Amino acid sequence: LKLLGIVKKVLGAI
């Protein structure tokens, strides 16, 4: 799992 990818998606969603 790419945690960094998930974090980036969350940051982009904010």
Swiss-Prot record:
Expressed by the venom gland. GO terms for biological process: defense response to bacterium; innate immune response. It is found in: Secreted; Target cell membrane. The keyword Membrane applies. It comes from the Eukaryota. GO terms for cellular component: extracellular region; membrane; other organism cell membrane. GO terms for molecular function: toxin activity. Keywords: Amidation, Antibiotic, Antimicrobial, G-protein coupled receptor impairing toxin, Immunity, Innate immunity, Mast cell degranulation, Membrane, Secreted, Target cell membrane, Target membrane, Toxin. The keyword Ligase does not apply. The modification Isoleucine amide is found at I14. Belongs to the MCD family. Mastoparan subfamily. Linear cationic alpha-helical peptide that acts as antimicrobial peptide. Has antibacterial activities against both Gram-positive and Gram-negative strains. Has no activity against the yeast C.albicans. Shows moderate mast cell degranulation, as well as leishmanicidal activities (IC(50)=36 uM). Has no hemolytic activity. Its mast cell degranulation activity may be related to the activation of G-protein coupled receptors in mast cells as well as interaction with other proteins located in cell endosomal membranes in the mast cells. This is Eumenine mastoparan-EM2.
